[in-house]
A protein has these predicted regions:
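Non-transmembrane, aqueous-exposed alpha-helical and coiled segments at domain scale
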Residues: 5-187
Length: 187
């Protein structure tokens, strides 16, 4: 963290440390809880955090507070990101570099909530099917697609078979299974 008057320090990034950041670091100056419509995004990887979350953050900084962003970790490997974001009040720093090498740090505050599907898939389905959810977006890397060796959809993949077998209290575990469960609930 670049702290005002102290240079680089190892202070944790949290909502309470934002006022102590160096003025060169852009910080969210809006009510992070505000927003009556929401975007639920599955797959909160680096691409999402550097693009969609940044765009939503910039809109909110400009006073457009209608939209809030909920992130969803779908895979077990997303646990590390969930833990890191939880320790930082769902804040993170995005550093961009201009063609001339100038760096710009910005704390992104658009992520109002992070849900972790492996532990609470029903919370994810609740968010996806909520009336205030207007947009469901996702970024899935090639490893997240349920394909066979030829790149074709594989109805026999472990995740697809688990989703198809889900019944009653069982919740799907794949991104598409979660979206389908939410769509069925919204009917």
């Amino acid at each position: 963290v670049l702290e005002r008057g102290r240079g680089m320090t190892s202070k944790a990034l949290t909502a309470s440390t934002l006022p102590r950041l160096d003025p060169s670091v852009a910080v969210p100056g809006y009510d992070r809880r505000a927003g009556e419509q929401q975007i639920v995004h599955l797959g909160v990887g680096g691409f999402h955090r550097a693009h969609l979350a940044q765009y939503v953050d910039r809109l909110r900084c400009a006073g457009e507070l209608r939209w809030r962003l909920i992130g969803v970790g779908v895979l077990e490997q997303d646990r590390a990101l969930r833990d890191a974001l939880a320790g930082q009040d769902n804040l993170y720093t995005l550093v961009t570099v201009d063609p001339d090498g100038a760096e710009h740090a910005r704390v992104i505050g658009a992520l109002s909530q992070y849900l972790f599907a492996p532990e609470d898939p029903q919370a994810v389905i609740d968010a996806l099917s909520a009336p205030q959810t207007r947009i469901i977006s996702m970024t899935i890397t090639e490893g997240g697609y349920e394909t066979d060796g030829a790149g074709e959809f594989s109805p026999r993949s472990r995740a697809v078979l688990a989703d198809l077998a889900a019944d009653g209290d069982d919740a799907p575990g794949s991104a598409l299974g979660l979206v389908i469960a939410a769509l069925q609930r919204r009917r």
